[in-house]
Structure formats: C-alpha cells, structure tokens
C-alpha cells in the first residue's frame, strides 16, 4: 500500500510502527531476538505495518507473512498454529525455526524456509495472535479497521483472486475473534481508518 503524508491510514500505520519499535527496543536486551506479532482482519494494514517496522528495525529482522503459510482458503486456524509450532516456539527456545511455505498455485506445501534465533522476527497475518502465541512474543499488535475500508483495500490489493473468498475468510476471522480474543492479548492496539 503506497503511503502518502496526508493519508490518515498511512499516519495511523506510521504511528503504530513507531510504538511497536519502542516496545521491541525494550526487548533487545533479552537473550532471544525480539518477536512481534501483527494481527487484524483482512485489509487492516498488517503487511504494510510489518514493512514499516522492518524498515527501521535496529539489526537483522525477518518478516514472515501467514499468507505464505495458510494451507489454502480454509486454513486460517491451521496457518496460525503452524506459525506457533514451527516458527514462534523454536525461535523463542533459541533454535532455528523451519517451516514449509504454501504453494497457492499447486494447492500444496512447497519450498522450505527458515529463520535463525538471532534474527528479530515479525510475524503478520490474520489469526496469529492467540493465547498460546502471545506467550512467545514481545510485542503483540492488533489492528482495528472498519469493514468497508478493509474490504476496499483488500480487493484493490488482490482483486478478483480474493473477491470470491472474502466472506469465507471473514467467517474464519470471526471464529478467531470469538475463540482467541486477539485484542485482549495485544500490547498495542492501532486504529486504522
């Protein structure tokens, strides 16, 4: 998403990035590299915020998008659990995290990926902030944004690929909100117009 100085969405995301970096800097003195979780419904601005945080991160950092992990359009919960088990838990334990990316074209698992324990980690995606994952992160962000704005941004970004799946995905997000209460676990809540 292009960011302009007079755009209220850009301003909200820049402010959230500044606050997230301040929280992450407090964790830099711990033995494990800091972990940031970014959750919010589709189109809230998670990917853009992750890029803003990574751009000013003080050291090596890796952004992992759950879009590369979800096993298809019905895989929100499974993608979040995969991130917790295969990325967050090993990283927090000081081990290299290893996982397989999802190949959306072939509809199956694809290439392997990894991140070392000394690298800061930003994991962004709907469903990532749960009670179990919250314990594995230093900074936990929930992005709140009106449904109409989110839908417009998401469909502008992904167009006809996403349009037939919007309601299906939103239902999985509803389940996540009801079961996991991600806003409750957030150390930072950002309101994005």
Region locations from a protein language model:
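NTP-dependent small-molecule kinase module
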Residues: 1-30, 135, 139, 152, ...
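P-loop (Walker A) phosphate-binding loop of NTP-binding proteins
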Residues: 41
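Conserved lysine of the Walker
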Residues: 46
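Post-Walker A helix-loop "phosphate-sensing" segment adjacent to the P-loop in P-loop NTPases
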Residues: 54-63
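Conserved nucleotide-sensing/catalytic segment adjacent to the nucleotide-binding pocket
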Residues: 62-64, 69-123
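Small-molecule kinase domains that catalyze NTP-dependent phosphoryl transfer to phosphate-bearing small molecules
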Residues: 108, 113, 130, 159-193
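ATP-dependent NMP and nucleoside kinases share a basic, alpha-helical "lid"
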Residues: 111-115, 120-156
């Amino acid at each position: 998403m292009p960011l302009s100085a007079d755009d209220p969405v850009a301003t909200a995301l820049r402010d959230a990035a500044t606050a997230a970096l301040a929280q992450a800097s407090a964790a830099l003195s711990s033995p494990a590299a800091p972990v940031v979780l970014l959750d919010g419904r589709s189109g809230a601005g998670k990917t853009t915020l992750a890029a803003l945080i990574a751009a000013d991160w003080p050291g090596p950092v890796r952004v992992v998008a759950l879009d590369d992990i979800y096993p298809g359009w019905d895989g929100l919960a499974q993608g979040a659990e995969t991130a917790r088990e295969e990325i967050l838990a090993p990283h927090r334990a000081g081990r290299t995290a290893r996982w397989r990316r999802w190949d959306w074209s072939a509809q199956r698992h694809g290439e392997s990926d990894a991140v070392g324990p000394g690298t800061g980690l930003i994991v962004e995606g709907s469903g990532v902030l749960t009670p179990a994952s919250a314990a594995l992160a230093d900074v936990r962000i929930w992005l709140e944004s009106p449904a109409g704005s989110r839908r417009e941004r998401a469909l502008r970004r992904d167009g006809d690929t996403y349009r037939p799946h919007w309601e299906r995905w939103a239902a999985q997000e509803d389940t996540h909100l009801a079961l996991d209460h991600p806003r409750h676990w957030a150390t930072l809540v950002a309101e994005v117009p």
